[in-house]
Amino acid sequence: MRKAGSRARAEAEGPHRAMEGGEVTGDRLKADTPDVSFEELLRLQGQGRPKAHKQLVAGNSTRTRSPQQPVCVADKHRPLEMSAKVRVPFLRQVVPISKKVARDPRFDDLSGDYNPEVFDKTYQFLNDIRAKEKQLVKKQLKRHRSGEERDKLQQLLQRMEQQEMAQQERKQQQELRLALKQERRAQAQQGHRPYFLKKSEQRQLALAEKFKELRRSKKLESFLSRKRRRNAGKDRRHLPLSKE
């Protein structure tokens, strides 16, 4: 009687124990096997067939598995991903940045070679503008008889005259070089060997042309007097100091 009572008690408690086990994994079993009833799963567990139960759960889970996401192709321009646990090396490879170089069009090869003759012809209008500015400065200089403003105008007029004289000297040198080039070309056409003047000889010819121009403009005496005073001042620097 005791054995029959214990067996009946076990059969009665069997479903209850299965239900207790189902409280732990019931939600998961329902999610994995939506097509199988919960009572069928408990019956399989109670009959001691865990293998069939696992196969049933595994088969339903494979059917309900969501499709995989498409694999994205990595972009070669993406930022470099590194682990934060990796120690940064002492010498790192830094991406070099191109240095900005200042470009002056006056000295750039893309602007072409400097030709004084072409430059003077292209910017011939600047001489007229300088002449008008010089006349304007002279008029303003007549209005200011004294004071700081007159000194500034006097210095400006002197600088403009010096620039004009320097431009005339450059023009004379260009004309002299052009004449020498034409003379050498004529000698080559006649069958003679062309003679190239030295720089010292070119300076002497330029000085002779300058003296001729000063004589024509009646400024030779003033030029020679200034040159004498300049040379005298240079000689005084080299003289020994007088002892008193």
From Swiss-Prot:
InterPro entries: RRP36. Residues 58-69 have a biased composition (Polar residues). Residues 8-33 have a biased composition (Basic and acidic residues). GO terms for biological process: ribosomal small subunit biogenesis; rRNA processing. It holds the Pfam family RRP36. A motif (Nuclear localization signal) lies at residues 226-229. Residues 141-190 form a coiled coil. Residues 1-74, 219-244 are annotated as: Disordered. Belongs to the RRP36 family. This is Ribosomal RNA processing protein 36 homolog. The gene is Rrp36.
